[in-house]
Amino acid sequence: MSSVQTIEVHTAPAYEVTIGAGLLRDCGARLKAVLGGCRIAVAVDSNVAPLYLETVCASLRDAGFAVCSYVFPAGEAHKNFTTLSAILEFLAESQLTRTDCVAALGGGVTGDMAGFAAASYLRGIRYVQLPTTLLSAVDSSVGGKTAIDLAAGKNLAGAFLQPAAVLCDTDCLRSLPAAVFADGAAEAIKTGVLSGETLFSLFEDGTLTDAPAEVIARCIRYKAGVVERDEKEQGERRKLNLGHTVGHAIEKCSGYAIPHGHAVAAGLAVMARASERLGWAEPGVSARIAACLEKNGLPTGTDYPAEALAKAALADKKRSGDSITIVVPKAIGDCELKRIPVTELLPIIAAGRGE
């Protein structure tokens, strides 16, 4: 494998995802080729700013960009209108125009909010993703979904806006605490369940720490193909929500104290057990998924009762009227979209919890 990999995502417009070491130090020159001359506002949270903001801003300035930056409080609890409004006011005060750009430097929360700010400001300006976590690298930085949370639930206000570029600096993964790295492992394992044995067996045979760049590349290639076929999530792309209906409910029930990846892992395990117990999945698939999650430091269940989870899930964006679409794992590489009445969600979750 070469030291730097480039994957093209053929959406409208198309863009490139670049994966390799040292990309933040070189981000100015790489983005200059994509953006030309413009002003860049870097959005970053209070955890990531001390680690990488100075490096990124220096690289951008060296490439001739005018640069400003906004630091907001870290954490899912701040992924809300208050923070979004503050970012938008900063963009206006900094006099960004429609030819300028927002750079999302950080994890999934930063990418979601900075992207939504870019989609909203002046009815849409360009943005780039500079993911610093495994979760944002393998999943949320690609595909153009942007959002904030509402009191009723997660990611309920947002927009689709494809980034102009994504630079995944694998050096950033070295600074991640084990729990944060595991967060990203959950989304990678989810992708393995969706894509098939080739990718999933990689996670069964060894932990993701063995070859993170290759894991990122494989996950992005799979997701890019899905997004290209269904950019606005009308069909196949909904399968990427595997584990997320219950996962988002777990996050909400915890007041977002449980991080996204850990919640998705638990949601995936619950849905796999439910699918097998209800006769939808081949025997043994839920045990394989649970073992893989455990090997990568992730939970395989939740203490929240089925009633609380079902109630929280009814605010999920995948609900439509009196029905909700769930993603059912039938085998590794075979997942089905199943539209069910909302009244059936509780017994399905209960089956997945062994109740």
Question: What are the roles of these predicted feature ranges?
Answer:
Residues S2-C101:
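ATP/NTP phosphate-donor binding region
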Residues S2-V4, A186-I189, W280-E355:
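C-terminal charged capping/lid subdomain of soluble metabolic enzymes
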Residues G20, V42, N80, P131, ...:
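Residue-level signal for inorganic ion chemistry
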Residues A74-G75, L105-G107, L242-G243:
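Glycine-rich beta-strand-to-loop/alpha-helix junction loops that act as flexible
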Residues L88-L105, A114-Q129:
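Non-catalytic interfacial helical region
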Residues V109-F116, A137, A249:
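Short glycine/serine/threonine-rich phosphate/pyrophosphate-binding segments
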Residues F116-G206:
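A glycine/threonine-rich phosphate-anchoring loop and its flanking beta-alpha core
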Residues S201-A308:
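Active-site segments that bind and position negatively charged phosphate/pyrophosphate groups
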